[in-house]
Amino acid sequence: SRIFCTMNKLHTLIYSVLIFTCLSCQQQTPQTQIEQTAIDFCEAFYNFNYPVAKEWSTPSSQSYLSFLASNVGQPHLEQLKTRGAAKVSVISSEIDANLEEASVVCQIKNAFVIHPIGGKMEYVSSLQDTLELVRVNNKWLIRKDIPQQNGKQSHD
């Protein structure tokens, strides 16, 4: 009877640990959230899927993405199809202390970049993009505004 009781406690402990482990897997850390958001955005952005990129963007970024989308033509899409999709990985990420802003540095391989002026497309085998993220209604969004002349971006 004593062995049975010990086995029961052991089973209960194992089940508790398993349940706790499963539950904790589902809760993403802020770090994981910002990195996944950055990857999702970059995969859409650098594969010219601007409607999906917009879903991960701040309201102020929408017009810039619409402008970029208007520069994408059939020749651009054909070249993208020939080369294959851009591949994205995270190099580093940082979240501010109050968990409202973050930045993620992504490496994008096999990418095309369309220059906003003139719509000329350039192939880049590897590039880095530093993304600024802000938390809006408990969701991390990318702030990708029109680059200013002095290199700074406008803010929401």
Please give the residue ranges for each predicted region.
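Sec-dependent bacterial lipoprotein signal peptides
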Residues: 1-23
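Exposed beta-sheet edge and beta->alpha loop/turn motif
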Residues: 95-156
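Short solvent-exposed beta->alpha transition segments
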Residues: 35, 50-103, 108-110
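Generic recognition of cysteine residues
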Residues: 5, 22-25, 42, 106
